[in-house]
């Protein structure tokens, strides 16, 4: 979904003009590209700005996901499709899926990972606070993949879920 959102806000994307009209030229660079760090600072500091951006971008992402699944269904050998949607539960109009998988980690790990993107402690906390708490996401999901441990443990969990989903998709 992140790639679809990036495409939607590109200069040739369907959301570009709406972002320009709503947020102004200050969130664009000299080449006409959305300056994602500037826009991120703005939308994670204001619920209203974040809601406005989501209202602009999410419909385009939902259409693209729907088209992708339609194309997938036409393939003779498809088992299941996976869509990575970072803010699935935070989206007011979350699309229905047969199964939901959440990747999760401890809060200290989450904070460290967000900080690795070059954000200040304050900015990182703003972004985390804008999300549904991990324990709530895990409760709403069909599967949870905890990513704090060893890579091999995560890989085993992914394989187990994949086997279960393969069985589910053939029923």
Which positions does each model-derived feature cover?
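Short hydrophobic/aromatic-enriched beta-strand-loop microsegments
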Residues: 1, 100-104, 121-122
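Well-ordered beta-strand positions
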Residues: 3, 41, 99, 142-143
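Short histidine/acidic/glycine/proline-rich micro-motifs that form metal-
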Residues: 5-6, 151
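ATP-dependent small-molecule kinase phosphotransfer cores
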Residues: 6-79
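Residue-level signature of catalytic and energy-coupling elements of molecular machines
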Residues: 53, 82, 145
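ATP-dependent NMP and nucleoside kinases share a basic, alpha-helical "lid"
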Residues: 62, 66-77, 81-116
């Amino acid at each position: 979904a992140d790639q679809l959102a990036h495409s939607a806000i590109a200069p040739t994307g369907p959301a570009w003009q709406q972002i320009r009209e709503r947020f102004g030229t200050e969130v664009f660079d000299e080449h006409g590209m959305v300056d994602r760090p500037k826009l991120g600072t703005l939308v994670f500091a204001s619920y209203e700005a974040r809601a406005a951006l989501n209202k602009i971008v999410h419909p385009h992402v939902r259409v693209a996901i729907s088209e992708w699944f339609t194309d997938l269904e036409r393939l003779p050998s498809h088992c299941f499709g996976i869509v990575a949607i970072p803010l699935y539960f935070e989206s007011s109009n979350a699309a229905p899926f047969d199964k939901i998988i959440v990747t999760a980690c401890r809060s200290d790990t989450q904070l460290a990972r967000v900080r690795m993107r070059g954000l200040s402690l304050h900015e990182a906390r703003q972004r985390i606070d804008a999300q549904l708490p991990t324990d709530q996401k895990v409760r709403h999901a069909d599967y949870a993949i905890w990513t704090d441990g060893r890579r091999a443990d995560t890989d085993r969990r992914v394989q187990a879920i994949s086997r279960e989903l393969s069985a589910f998709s053939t029923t």
